[in-house]
Structure formats: C-alpha cells, structure tokens
Amino acid sequence: MTNILIVTSSPRGPEGLSTRFATEIAEGLKTALGGTLSRRDLAANPPPHIAQAYIGGRVVGPETRTPEQAKAVGLAQELVDEVTAADVIVLGSGMINFGPSSQLKAWFDHITWPGVTFGYSAAGKPQGLLTGKKVYLVTASGGVFSEGDWAAFDFQTGYLRHLLSFIGLTDIQIIRVEGTVFGPEAAKAAIAATEAQVRAVLEKAA
C-alpha cells in the first residue's frame, strides 16, 4: 500500500496554482497507486515559528519537559511522523518575495530535527535519515525563474531542494508553473504547460 502525503502552503488556498497542481498530482497518484492520502495545509493551519520551548524541549527527556515544551515538541513529532509514514510526498510552494512562504519555512524548521531526520557520520558529514521516498515539488511563480535574467533570483526551488535533500529526500521531481503574470494568453500557455507536466507524472505512475 502506498502512503501519499500532500503538503500545501499557498495563502491563496485552493485558488493557488501550486495547491491546484499539487492536489491534482496527489489525487491522481492515489487513483493510480491506491493506498492512502494524507493532507497538511500549512496556510489553513500554519505551524508556529520555532521558539525556545521547541529548542529546549527537544534536547530533554519527555518526563522533564514543561507543558509548553511538550506541546511544541509534540507538534514537531506529529509533522515528522507524517513525513516518515509517507512513501510519496507532494509539496506545493508558491513563491513569495522570491522564496517560499514563511509557513513552509516553519514546517521545515520543525521537521529538520538532528538525530531524528538527519545525523552526522563519524567524519562529520551530514546524513539525511528520511530515505527511500519520492517527492514531487510543485512550485508556482508569476514570473519566469527557470531560465533567463530572473533565474538568479529564484530562492525558492534550490532552497527547497536543498532542505529536502538534507533530510534524505533526494528523489525529487520538480513541476513548475511560471510566467502567469504576463497577460491572459501567457497565463493560459503556462497553465497548459504545467498540465502537460502533471499528465506525464501520472502516466508514468500508472
């Protein structure tokens, strides 16, 4: 049985293109592969930014945590458990000021946990611990950042790929929807191009 986790983060909710196409992929994969589909909407239920309760709570035993620490670490453990249980992860990220949303950054801050999702070798080299999973990363941007003059300002795609790889999620396929702000025809073409990418993903999975 295949366990699929979809994580969306667009403040626009279902109207966001990253959410739309991530949902199409996740639901299409469930149809093709069977199994379960779990959903985490970071815009509707944003995780808090990490604070002292989380930082201090994760380095002490459960029996010595304060109520605030237990709550903070409990949320992080819940988010880690969702990722750990998944065989396939579909991650939707709409670009905000050249990078991912703060909600998505907070999610990564909770699941990037030393000794749990990453560790270090004897030589001091970081090693991701969440291995053997497939990730579909759906990114959305109004401009075109995959090439051309603005490619240097894409602080979303490479950053997310690095964070995923750091915790062991190295099998990543990127699906972009971009160039939607240059008029109706450009938006139509951009969406059609992404729809073709989504079809290719689902045809390969079938």
Swiss-Prot record:
Instruction: List UniProt keywords, sorted A-Z.
Output: Flavoprotein, FMN, NAD, Oxidoreductase, Plasmid
Q: Does the keyword Oxidoreductase apply?
A: yes
Q: What are the EC numbers? A: 1.6.5.-, 1.7.1.17
Question: Where, by residue number, does FMN bind?
Answer: 10
Manner of cofactor binding, per the entry note: Binds 1 FMN per subunit.
Q: What InterPro entries is this protein classified in? A: Flavodoxin_fold, Flavoprotein-like_sf, FMN-dep_NADH:Q_OxRdtase_AzoR1, NADH:quinone_OxRdtase_FMN_depd
EC class, as a word, reads oxidoreductase
Instruction: Give cofactor(s), names only.
Output: FMN
Catalytic activity, reaction form: 2 a quinone + NADH + H(+) = 2 a 1,4-benzosemiquinone + NAD(+); N,N-dimethyl-1,4-phenylenediamine + anthranilate + 2 NAD(+) = 2-(4-dimethylaminophenyl)diazenylbenzoate + 2 NADH + 2 H(+)
- Which top-rank group of organisms is this from? Bacteria
So which residues are the signal peptide here? none
Show the GO MF annotations: electron transfer activity; FMN binding; oxidoreductase activity, acting on NAD(P)H as acceptor; oxidoreductase activity, acting on NAD(P)H, quinone or similar compound as acceptor
Q: Which family does it belong to?
A: Belongs to the azoreductase type 1 family.
The subunit field of the Swiss-Prot or TrEMBL record says: Homodimer.
This chain's function reads: Quinone reductase that provides resistance to thiol-specific stress caused by electrophilic quinones. Also exhibits azoreductase activity. Catalyzes the reductive cleavage of the azo bond in aromatic azo compounds to the corresponding amines.
Protein name as catalogued: FMN-dependent NADH:quinone oxidoreductase 2
Organism field: Rhizobium etli (strain ATCC 51251 / DSM 11541 / JCM 21823 / NBRC 15573 / CFN 42)
Q: Which gene encodes it?
A: azoR2
